[in-house]
Swiss-Prot record:
Similarity remark: Belongs to the mitoguardin family.
Name this protein carries in UniProt: Mitoguardin 1
Keyword Secreted recorded: no
Chain segments annotated as transmembrane: 11-31, 38-58
Underlying gene: miga1
Organism of derivation: Danio rerio
Pfam families: Miga (PF10265)
Gene Ontology CC: one annotated term: mitochondrial outer membrane
Compartment(s) of residence: Mitochondrion outer membrane
Length: 595
């Protein structure tokens, strides 16, 4: 085929077939023989148009269906919510044993107990639905406007609240109440489980082996129950403070009262059950039992006494807390945050207990002598570290102690302290709070003139020390002019401060040295001691005697720690070791021993 034939004007169909379809020559020569009518051509065109339209419509529906599936987390949450309700209803009709072989049914309680303690389950599901709906509707910005109507319908169906501070507060309270229910469930479940296991063992093995098994269970459960009840008491007090911001709760419906009432009711039931089980064990064991009836009765009394005691591990503190809530306890300065208390009522309740314990401690002459001697030795060591003679300080300190030993001066001393806000005469209010803590606070915020002198790099350390001492003496001189009693307790106290205040001020504000290390260590020990005596886990608030015993024990431990620090410092000084890092290491080791 030549090029002229292909370019002829009367062969358009053949040229199109050759150029676009690349047909073989056999098909090319058969094209002139094919002839299509007009109707066939119209039918072919309609069929092609319909096929293309169907393809486009199908692809359009497929895209819309994919977008609907992408926005279905709210529907999934709704389905999970309905499934959870269905499962909770099914759990009422059957109970699964705890030690089941099925791993998916382990640690499941009975349906009735689960139904009782899962009152806030819908609230938790609503919280999850709220978070999922907000994240799903705003995750894809291109789809938010297209499906605004569907999202509005879902929100109206689930009645989701608006995220306001009040709603978030209520949501947090619901979750907190859920945690309280779980802890109460653990408390009741653990105690009942121990009773049931003990009763079963007593029936199967006999009275002798039953007592051994039950005693071991009591040791384990007693520690756990005591810690859990302490946690619940703190949680209840925290819940009262939270609810106080919105309204006053009814004391009869308080969880503490309800829990105590339930436990008192359970005690009577447990005693009856235990008596029955013990009688059964005696009848079954017969002569093979090595436990007499008197021993069984004594064991039952010990168990009931421990159960009653575990209801209130800190009765002395609970009574003081009631007084604090009624506004019957006052103080000069609230140190709630510094001593890490749960609230002002908690601080005042513990303060009331500590005041009484301090009075018991100071009744012993040996304890007063120990405190006076320890204080004099520590303060004399601080003065000696400043390379000054502590002789005059020890003299005025002994004069102040002898002045306090005479009871004739106590009335005037009480009046002097009362005029300065100290309304209670005890070791905490006078020594720890009024003298030590106020001094530490004054040293943390010194006057601007002293700060300017100390921070001046062009002045020598000796000049700075002299300036700090002069400033302290001028302040004490001004205070002496306002004294009403010239030979009272405040006068003796100012005489002591004239020797120790400049040294302490330079120790805290001066350069890094052994004096500053010991001053900081002394302050830390005082703060640690205060935090310990205001901690329910460090001291026993069971009674006045136990609290006084623990406070005195902590006093000896902290004093021994300070004396050990001084002893190690003297040893290193004699050995020629002057590196301050050694002192810090030893202080850390000594602190680890106390903690």
């Amino acid at each position: 085929m030549n090029e002229d034939v292909l370019r002829s004007s009367h062969l358009p169909i053949k040229l199109a077939a050759l150029h676009f379809l690349d047909l073989p020559l056999s098909v090319y020569y058969s094209l002139p023989q094919v002839s299509l009518s007009t109707g066939t051509k119209k039918l072919f065109a309609a069929t092609a148009f319909g096929a293309v339209s169907l393809i486009i419509i199908a692809r359009r529906f497929r895209r819309r269906k994919g977008r609907r599936k992408a926005n279905s987390p709210v529907e999934q949450e709704t389905f999970e919510f309905l499934t959870t309700i269905h499962l909770s209803k099914e759990s009422d009709s059957q109970s699964v044993p705890q030690n089941s072989e099925n791993p998916y049914t382990c640690n499941v309680v009975s349906g009735a107990l689960y139904n009782k303690l899962s009152g806030s389950l819908p609230s938790l599901v609503s919280v999850r639905s709220r978070h999922s709906s907000s994240s799903s509707t705003c995750a894809n910005g291109s789809n938010c406007w297209e499906e605004a109507g569907d999202a509005a319908d879902v929100c109206n169906l689930l009645s989701l609240p608006v995220a306001t501070p009040e709603n978030l507060y209520l949501m947090g309270m619901e979750l907190f109440e859920e945690a309280l229910r779980r802890w109460e469930q653990a408390l009741t479940f653990r105690s009942r489980q121990a009773e049931d296991e003990g009763s079963c063992v007593s029936v199967k093995l006999g009275a002798g082996d039953a007592i051994a098994e039950e005693s071991m269970e009591d040791i384990i459960s007693a520690d756990f129950i005591q810690k859990l009840e302490s946690l619940l008491q703190r949680a209840y007090r925290l819940q009262e403070e939270f609810e106080g911001s919105l309204g006053v709760t009814d004391p009869t419906t308080h969880p503490t009262n309800v829990l105590l009432a339930d436990k008192h009711m359970d005690l009577s039931v447990r005693e009856e059950l235990e008596d029955t089980c013990l009688r059964d064990s005696i009848s079954i064991a017969s002569t093979d039992s090595f436990v007499s009836a008197a021993e069984l009765s004594e064991h039952r009394e010990m168990r009931s006494g421990h159960a009653l005691g575990s209801l209130s591990p800190h009765p002395f503190y609970e009574d003081a807390l009631q007084m604090a809530e009624e506004g019957k306890i006052s103080c000069r300065v609230l140190r709630t945050e510094m001593l890490e208390c749960l609230g002002d009522a908690d601080f005042l309740a513990k303060l009331h207990c500590v005041r009484q314990a301090c009075q018991v401690i100071l009744c012993e002459r040996a304890t007063r002598a120990f405190l006076a001697d320890t204080g004099k030795r520590i303060l004399s060591a601080i003065i000696a570290k400043a390379r000054k003679s502590p002789k005059r300080f020890e003299e005025v300190f002994e004069e102040m102690i002898s002045f306090l030993e005479h009871t004739d001066h106590w009335e005037n001393t009480e009046n002097e302290l009362s005029s300065r806000g100290v309304k209670h005469m005890n070791f905490y209010d006078v020594v720890l709070d009024f003298i030590l803590m106020d001094s530490f606070e004054d040293l943390e915020n010194p006057p601007l003139s002293i700060q300017t002198v100390v921070n001046n790099r062009w002045l020598s350390n000796s000049f700075k020390e002299t300036a700090v001492a002069s400033s302290c003496w001028s302040v004490l001189k001004q205070k002496r002019q306002h004294m009403k009693v010239q030979d009272g307790f405040i006068a003796h106290f100012y005489a002591v401060c004239e020797h120790i205040s400049p040294v302490l001020a330079w120790g805290f504000l001066g350069p890094k040295c052994t004096l500053q290390d010991f001053c900081c260590f002394f302050k830390e020990q005082v703060l640690f001691f205060l935090k310990d005596i205001f901690d329910l886990d460090k001291v026993r608030y069971f009674s006045l005697e136990t609290l006084a015993e623990d406070i005195l024990h902590l006093l000896h431990r902290r004093s021994d720690l300070l004396m050990a620090y001084l002893a190690t410092d003297v040893i290193h000084h004699l050995n020629g070791c002057s590196d301050t890092s050694v002192h810090l290491v030893h202080s850390a080791l000594l602190e680890a021993q106390v903690q």
